[in-house]
A protein has these predicted regions:
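N-terminal secretory signal peptides that target proteins for export/translocation
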Residues: 1-7
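Short polybasic amphipathic segments
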Residues: 67-76, 129-140
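Charged, amphipathic alpha-helical segments
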Residues: 55-62, 87, 105-125
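Bacterial Sec-dependent signal peptides at the C-terminal "C-region" and cleavage site
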Residues: 21-32
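Short, surface-exposed coil-to-beta transition loops
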Residues: 57-58, 97-99, 131-133
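C-terminal partner/receptor-binding element of secreted or periplasmic proteins
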Residues: 132-133, 138-172
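Bacterial N-terminal signal peptides
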Residues: 12-22
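N-terminal secretory signal peptides
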Residues: 30-92, 101
């Protein structure tokens, strides 16, 4: 089975690879590993793999992985305002969907990026219509200070589980 990629180029390459596999009739599984991008994605540096990345207004938030470690960054390219390597990850499933979170700690602040999938309704054909949201939750001393949605849907890479230790789910 081909590996999953979050980039459009990766999806295109994956589809092309599946077409080629169908023509040949054999498949070779790929080893799961972090693949670095040749061009930086949002706030990820060259050689880092984006585990999460989205725009929030004029700024960006990203979690990037490299060599079994991950880093949270917030700001603008070339002007990062906050960096943290104190990260935890949580997942919670619920009827009709679930949520994945990565939380970065900095003193008494917690910055939680999340992606959530919910059942938004049923289509006329009986299909489940999924609603996807992603964003950033900011807490100080355990109290919500701000919540911001990403521009567009962003997902947390499944590869994050391999390098970010488990932590508590942050309700919001």
């Amino acid at each position: 089975m081909a590996g999953i990629s979050t980039s459009v180029a990766g999806i295109t390459a994956g589809i092309g690879g599946l077409i080629a596999l169908a023509a040949v009739g054999t498949a070779r599984p790929s080893a799961p590993r972090l693949r670095a991008m040749t061009q930086p994605v949002a706030l990820c540096r060259p050689g880092e793999a984006p585990l999460f990345s989205c725009a929030i207004g004029p700024k960006q938030v990203a979690v990037c992985g490299r060599n079994g470690a991950a880093v949270y960054r917030f700001g603008r390219p070339g002007q990062v305002e906050l960096t943290s390597t104190a990260l935890t990850m949580a997942m919670r499933g619920f009827a009709g969907g679930g949520e994945t979170q990565i939380t970065a700690s900095n003193k008494d602040y917690r910055y939680t990026v999340f992606d959530r999938t919910t059942r938004a309704g049923f289509g006329d054909d009986g299909r489940h219509d999924a609603g996807m949201t992603s964003g950033l939750l900011i807490q100080r001393a355990g109290r919500n200070v701000a919540a911001r949605r990403c521009t567009g849907a962003a997902t947390i890479s499944a590869k994050a589980q391999a390098i970010i230790r488990p932590g508590p789910y942050i309700p919001h």
